[in-house]
Amino acid sequence: MAIHINKNYLVNLAFAVIALSLIILGSRYYNHYVSAYTDVTIDSKVLNETRKIFIRLPSNYDANKTYSLIIKTDGNFNLDKWDESLTMLAKKQGGKQAILVAIPNLFFVSSRNRDLVPPYARQEVNTEARLDDGTQPNGEADKFLQFIEIELLPYLSSKFKLNNNRVLSGFSAGGSFVLYVFHTKTELFNGYFAFSPAPWYDDMTVVSKVDTFLKSNKEAFKQPTYLFLSVGGDEHPLMLEAYNNLEQTFKTNHNNNLLWESIINPNAEHNDNPLLSVADALGGYQRFLNKTP
């Protein structure tokens, strides 16, 4: 028996599928690339693309007052937790607050590893040492750092009154970006938060770079600097091994101008750890500022 399918039915079905796909895409775009705060676009000559930033101002923001600045990677990820933690910290401090700027990854282009992986490691991250055959593109964290230093920071300084307290925060690949900036442009920030960083890239190359920096650049810390490290106790064994190596590097290379803290959150997996770490990092940084002359 022949089955007859109405052409209008097929057309309507196709339109329904397309409409549903567009709704899903729009929802994903909104969740990823639109924030609950102030969204601004910057035409970056360094990156040769337009980048968006999310700006969270303090609830009692006063344009005549100066504020500390926090820059975080990964845009909306964990942003609600940051808002909650900053609000709670401000209540404890009697109103002192910071401006938080989150940089989302691009939506239609895969930019996360490109921007956050250091230039001495492969974009397609690997546990083994890289081969010098020129076939595997490096990360471009150096360009992303340039964007922050020569485009984003001047833009923010032109719009807001900022003091000298600056924090850079990142999670996972973003944590490795934090460590990259820490050992290549130390003076750019006086606070660094690296949640579950990935120093295992290319046979622990991030650990090696940090170790070499600490051993050979004793004078690099021209100002008191704070570093917060954390990892989840139930993360991948390779992550925990690399984290332990990183801890040992800091333990054996003391510097009077560097205060670093490390927390291992029991029973926490990779995506749990940053949620548990934000308040601790902010509290540690504030204690550091209180002790700094």
Residue map of PLM features:
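N-terminal secretory signal peptides that target proteins for export/translocation
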Residues: 1-6
